[in-house]
Amino acid sequence: MALDLRTIFQCEPSENNLGSENSAFQQSQGPAVQREEGISEFSRMVLNSFQDSNNSYARQELQRLYRIFHSWLQPEKHSKDEIISLLVLEQFMIGGHCNDKASVKEKWKSSGKNLERFIEDLTDDSINPPALVHVHMQGQEALFSEDMPLRDVIVHLTKQVNAQTTREANMGTPSQTSQDTSLETGQGYEDEQDGWNSSSKTTRVNENITNQGNQIVSLIIIQEENGPRPEEGGVSSDNPYNSKRAELVTARSQEGSINGITFQGVPMVMGAGCISQPEQSSPESALTHQSNEGNSTCEVHQKGSHGVQKSYKCEECPKVFKYLCHLLAHQRRHRNERPFVCPECQKGFFQISDLRVHQIIHTGKKPFTCSMCKKSFSHKTNLRSHERIHTGEKPYTCPFCKTSYRQSSTYHRHMRTHEKITLPSVPSTPEAS
């Protein structure tokens, strides 16, 4: 990460960074920290100096910065390693992830200002780790740190795309085109559930990102929500296809070109996206396996040239999906791929949403309490499922044998027993409320 010297050294330095070195640093600020009434006079002096001489202000600025660095780093007293340590610590303090500068300062002093000893004693309690960002590009997806440069993300995913294309070519399977994985502009949706409202739009992301074949590269960057979500196979929600969503926020990426991929001013769509939603079938179509999620976070209709709704069929089972992202998440189950790993217990998950739900277990937080028996739960959906024990409600009814169930997970396990003996056509039942 490049240092912005103007930001670091013209402004007041970090409060708790380097102890006594800051005194010399603050004293060298010069007239730039005068009282408010003296600012205009100083500005005129600087302007006149800049206009009347040949780049004298530029030379003065460089000399001022040299004095600041010299008085701060004191090369006559410190070795090269000590100077590097000072710069590293300063960058760590202003990097945005340090949440307890006072504690870091104390550890720096207690280590004798030795960087190696300081690193050994430093724990994650004093920093905010960078958030994880879920990136989806041309059918490939991965989890990256928010600090990772966009060019590295694109290079990594491009290698995955090329590897998959090579495998498909060897198998004689036509590869997916970029049109199949492009996300077109979807209509905004409003969702109100569990007291949570959201309104968002999914935007097609293809501006100025091209590869050597002049094909559009669609890049979706999804900021995963940390809120609780029902974990598949556990105590599930009262509606098997409801989920929380985050607003989509657009941001501008870096500019650059690498390995034939050009990306300039790439709009990045950030929000809770389709990949993070658990893949489940609705009760009405449990055996036809066609997704009917009208308010899904994949509210992106991919249509052909004649406006016909596309569908995506799994090659290993009869399931058909309306959205490509659901198919990709489903196929990971056939391959038993669990790319999302808990850093605490190393347990793998098929979907990022499952990982988020699992991580709440490690926190030990159970903020939702039953009003009848005072039992606590980590998720509101789990609480609602538990409350049905008291009310006797069983909203999930099998369309074949009319057996009712309190939890959707139990309902889906029961429906799989019918899949082995029933034709694909399934009578529909009213949606459980």
From Swiss-Prot:
Example GO molecular function: sequence-specific double-stranded DNA binding
Zinc finger motifs (C2H2-type), residue ranges: 312-334, 340-362, 368-390, 396-418
Superkingdom of origin: Eukaryota
CDD domains for this protein: SCAN
Region (Disordered): 165-210, 275-301
A GO CC annotation given for this chain: nucleus
Biased composition (Polar residues): 165-185, 195-210, 277-299
SUPFAM superfamilies for the chain: beta-beta-alpha zinc fingers, Retrovirus capsid dimerization domain-like
Segments traversing the membrane: none
Record localization: Nucleus; Chromosome, Telomere
Family annotation (InterPro entries): SCAN_dom, SCAN_sf, Znf_C2H2_sf, Znf_C2H2_type
Function: Embryonic stem (ES) cell-specific transcription factor required to regulate ES cell pluripotency. Binds telomeres and plays a key role in genomic stability in ES cells by regulating telomere elongation. Acts as an activator of spontaneous telomere sister chromatid exchange (T-SCE) and telomere elongation in undifferentiated ES cells.
Protein name per the record: Zinc finger and SCAN domain-containing protein 4
UniProt source species: Homo sapiens
Designated gene of the protein: ZSCAN4
